[in-house]
Design a protein with these regions (language model features):
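Conserved beta-strand segments that form the floor/walls of ligand-binding pockets within enzyme
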Residues: 1, 6, 147
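Core nucleotidyl-transferase/polymerase catalytic module
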Residues: 3-5, 43-44, 56, 62
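Conserved acetyl-CoA-binding loop-helix of GNAT-fold acetyltransferases
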Residues: 4-7, 13-26, 156-168
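Short polybasic/polar patches that bind polyanions
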Residues: 12, 29, 50
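Conserved GNAT acetyl-CoA-binding A-motif
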Residues: 21, 28-41, 170-181
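Active-site/acyl-donor-binding loops of N-acyltransferases
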Residues: 50-72, 149-156, 160-201
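Amide-forming acyltransferase catalytic core, primarily the GNAT-like/NAT-type
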Residues: 55-151, 156-157
């Protein structure tokens, strides 16, 4: 799992990234990896990665969140979690495995994701009721709104408690949630995949 790859300005347009990707493909093949996935950081990178054998296969839809004006249930406690906790990974992994189609991250991947959150100004919120995890959300700050990358909750009360805590913590009232692609909603390109071991696949 790599979070953020870029080339030093002095070495751009010299094939450094192409060589890095070629070496990573060879290493993945040796390690028995069947396919590689990535999320381009900028729209123009979709074309670049397509030239390296990747295809745009993952899409997402969005939903604007409108918070009702009332205080959430007091028995649901929401906190910001700045560091990796295995209990949170287990909950998130369980909830994501309930989706029809979803990339599952390993425990090691999740540790990198938590580090990336700290670097990129994101947050992980966890909702607990009687010390049991009932919901988790991962957010990033956009220019004028919050981007909700993941939102898993046991019920609407927990979901609202998480959203209310986001607004209280960040001061942002506008939130946009990223969702699995929905037929009735516009779909946007998100991620790409490349087969590494064609014979095995």
């Amino acid at each position: 799992y790599i979070s953020g790859a870029c080339t030093h300005p002095d070495f751009r347009s010299k094939g450094v990234m192409r060589e890095l990707l070629s070496q990573s493909f060879a290493r993945m093949l040796r390690n028995g990896v069947h396919f590689s996935t990535l999320i381009p950081a900028e729209p123009w990178l979709f074309d670049y990665y397509a030239r390296m054998g990747y295809a745009s296969v993952f899409k997402y839809s969005t939903k604007e969140i409108v918070l009702p004006e009332f205080i959430p249930a007091k028995e649901i406690a929401v906190s910001v979690v700045p560091e990796f906790q295995e209990e949170i990974y287990s909950y998130l992994n369980k909830k994501l495995s309930e989706r029809a189609c979803c990339i599952q991250h390993t425990l090691e991947d999740f540790q990198v994701i938590m580090t990336d959150l700290a670097i990129s100004g994101g947050y992980l919120f966890v909702a607990r009721q009687e010390n049991e995890i009932k919901g988790v959300t991962i957010i990033y700050k956009g220019d004028k709104h919050i981007i909700i990358n993941e939102l898993c909750a046991e019920d609407k009360d927990v979901e609202y408690s998480l959203l209310y805590a986001i607004r209280q913590h960040t001061g942002y009232k506008r939130m946009v949630q990223l969702l699995p692609p929905e037929d009735q909603q516009p779909q946007h390109p998100l991620g790409m995949a490349r087969i590494i071991n064609a014979k095995e696949v």
